[in-house]
Design a protein with these regions (language model features):
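Charged docking surfaces used in two-component/phosphorelay signaling
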Residues: 15-23
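Acidic catalytic/metal-coordinating carboxylates
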Residues: 12, 33-36, 59-65
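Conserved acidic carboxylate
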Residues: 8
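C-terminal output helix
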Residues: 106-116
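Active-site residues of response regulator receiver
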Residues: 52, 82
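The feature encodes the CheY-like receiver
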Residues: 56-59, 74, 86
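Short hydrophobic/Thr-rich beta-strand motif most characteristic of the beta2 strand and flanking loop
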Residues: 25-32, 40, 102
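Short amphipathic alpha-helix used as the core "switch/output" element in two-component signaling
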Residues: 39, 61-74
Length: 127
């Protein structure tokens, strides 16, 4: 079973993403802050991290940089998940090294397809 770490501080968004992923057969882990997300990503090595950009203690871009600084963290796909769709924000996010960008509100169909593609590719590379 593939494991997805959700880093999200909004309870409603967390519940939606968790419920969709669990319905599709993924195991989910949850973190409500950037620092907790970094720690869990490095310690638990999930198949995918879904990282909110605006978090209370550390933004998602900074959290990604810390994950990528760790040798094992370079191999984990990390998606930016954000409601911020301003062009300058999106360019900054894309330049940060995220593997994909998912905008809120989430389109469930495309979200599930994107997650599935990345998890399958990661599983193939690790075999």
């Amino acid at each position: 079973m593939s494991v997805v770490l959700i880093v999200e501080d909004n309870d409603k968004n967390m519940k939606l993403v968790r419920d969709v992923l669990q319905f599709k057969g993924y195991q989910t882990l949850e973190a409500t802050s950037g620092r907790e997300g970094v720690r869990m990503a490095i310690e638990l090595l999930p198949d995918l991290v879904l990282m909110d950009i605006q978090l209370p203690d550390m933004d998602g871009v900074s959290a990604l940089a810390e994950i990528r600084a760790h040798p094992h963290g370079r191999k984990i796909p990390v998606f930016a998940v954000t409601a911020s769709v301003m062009p300058h924000d999106q360019k900054r996010i894309e330049a940060s090294g995220f593997d994909a960008f998912i905008s809120k509100p989430i389109n469930v169909k495309s979200f599930v397809e994107t997650v599935g593609r990345f998890v399958a590719a990661r599983k193939e590379r690790s075999e």
